[in-house]
Amino acid sequence: MAKDFLLEIGTEEIPAKFAPGVLNQLREQAQKYCQELRLDYQDLKVYTTPRRFAVLIQGLAEKQTDFTAEVKGPAVKAAYDAEGNPTKAAQGFARGQGVEPKDLFVQELNGVSYVYARKFELGQPTLQLLPKLCTDLITGLHFPKPMRWADLEFRFARPIRWIVALFGSEVIPFEFVGLASGKASRGHRTLGGPVTLDSPADYEKQMLQAFVMVDPEQRRQSVWEQIHALAAKVGGDVEKDDDLLDEVTHIIEYPTALLGEVAPNYMHLPEPVITTPMKEHQRYFPVRDKEGKLLPYFITVRNGDDYALAKVKAGNEKVLKARLEDAAFYYREDQKTPLAELVEKLDKVTYHEKLGSVRQRVERIRTLARGIAARLGMESEKQDLVERTALLAKADLVTLMVYDFPELQGIMGADYARMVGEKPEVCTGILEHYQPRFAGDELPQSYTGQIVSVADKLDAIVGAFGIGIQPTGSQDPYALRRQAQGVVGIILEAGWDISLEQLIAASYVNFAEQGISLLPLADLQSALQDFFQQRLRFVLQEQGARYDTLDAVLAQGSNQITRAARKAQVLAAKRETTEFVPYSQAYIRCLNLSKKAQTQPLDPKNLIDPTEIALAAALVQRQEAFAALIEKGDYAEAYALASELIPMIEALFNAVMIMVEDEILKQARLALLGECVAILGCLGDLSLLA
């Protein structure tokens, strides 16, 4: 017979950001322990609220399944002597498996006879196993910043205040951090009280009666439905913000949404100035009309019921009014100083003690951005607009608005630039240059935004690597991986045919001209090429590229990001064709043999067989056209041209032996194969394909 199992860990208030990770850990750990302990079950659920974590296993077997296993021991010839008596090897093996030597039996494996022991383990009652399972579940949870409390050495998200552990209606007896397990849980902090749980099956129902909705998905759905219903009452809607919705879900136990109003005199402010305090500081949901225009309403979610809801509404409106009053003041004050005049104030803002001020950084970005525009062949007027964008891009960092609302950097700069009559390209570039701000964010679309964004991110990456700051494992405090991914994404989307090595060198020079010392350029180039190649690999894999396709392409380097991606695209298509098999076979055969060649160039006069003479002539005939295709980055046509050589290469291998005794002839043939490898490998090192 099966019973339900419940473990609830009651704590002090837990940060919302911990919840998703804990849910995954609890589920994975519980599944793992049940499998290891041979405990069958029907279903497994995990729960979290700000004051508890819980796991409910439905239909958990009352005892382990019995266990029978056949364990391989030594070979028969080592297990028995000439008289058939067990040797010390057999005796030791039997003893280790808990069986008698006479119980060993023989089985054949891969043509060799071995002795085996058959082990049988009777399943234990589940209740005997659960105290340790509960303890292991608790100690197996990990948090970003665990804490200690009282005089305990144990660390947890927040202090543990109660533990519920039930198997059916029976308490699972154990003690942890000075707390004895039991049936006593706690309801909502103000609306509920002590809750004596009768059985795991009634957990959700009993907790809901105590104003705790333990299922986070149920809470999330309730929040979303209430928000939509309230927005509809004023003819509006709420744009789905999963991050905000998740955060709100994990800071409440019993959701009640309410509609608040925004004072009309603040609606003239730029939309981000209104919505940022709402979302980032107050966790409110802005309400919009059907066209997406902001309405003078917000929705917030209370952790409680509808008691005194009017008073709660007024309190939230008052808090938002104070926030918006500050924002309105900052907005007025910031407009008194033109954006261009703020640039010089950046000299007093330290970017990094080893990398100078933000003003110095602006100059580096400005120089690099113009250089990129020039490398892309842009006319002088566009280069000027790129340079102007770079000059003003960081100016809003010293505004009152951005000082109080850092999330608005770039957004306010673009708005203030518009006010003083900067060109649209400059305003858009200022707005976009921080993009992508997070994983999955949009890339800049304007040329000013793209170029300044790449220059900004490259300066940050080169500077950080140059003073020895690199991401390690899961640690990346300067978000260098995200910035590198942004650089890769922008270059790919814009289709720039540009050398990463040259950009890194140009950025390095900018630091040197300001007297800022970095690690040697050669060391930086090597580290950064590897770093960007990892990011390129990640981006292309996300787009569906196979790992071995990327191995083949990236073995030839990724200095020109767009070209490497184009190669991967062509190779992915070509490897699916029937013609690719003989092509790759010819490449690999040529490659393996050419490795034995000396470094001398091919001299066709040393070739004697008609097949090799014809192949050498074909290589010369196609050399100029092939080089032109590679220069253009037309890898599909380059592959097609290289494919014309395959019949001639096959004819060569059928007609002659490469490794002949005549050293001059042998080296000529090996050099010829080396020339073939150079052309056939136009898409990558095909020997790395699985």
Swiss-Prot record:
What InterPro entries is this protein classified in?
DALR_anticod-bd, Gly-tRNA-synth_bsu, Gly-tRNA-synth_heterodimer
A single cellular component GO annotation: cytosol
Q: Does the keyword rRNA-binding apply?
A: no
EC number, as in UniProt: 6.1.1.14
Protein name per UniProt: Glycine--tRNA ligase beta subunit
What are the GO MF terms of this UniProt record? Answer: arginine-tRNA ligase activity; ATP binding; glycine-tRNA ligase activity
Indicate the enzyme's highest-level EC class.
ligase
Key words of the record: Aminoacyl-tRNA synthetase, ATP-binding, Cytoplasm, Ligase, Nucleotide-binding, Protein biosynthesis
Which superkingdom is the protein from? Bacteria
Is Heme a UniProt keyword of this protein? no
Location(s) in or outside the cell: Cytoplasm
Q: Which family does it belong to?
A: Belongs to the class-II aminoacyl-tRNA synthetase family.
Q: Which NCBIfam families match?
A: glyS
| Reaction(s) catalysed by this chain's protein | tRNA(Gly) + glycine + ATP = glycyl-tRNA(Gly) + AMP + diphosphate
HAMAP family given for it? Answer: Gly_tRNA_synth_beta
Biological process according to GO:
arginyl-tRNA aminoacylation; glycyl-tRNA aminoacylation
Q: How does it assemble?
A: Tetramer of two alpha and two beta subunits.
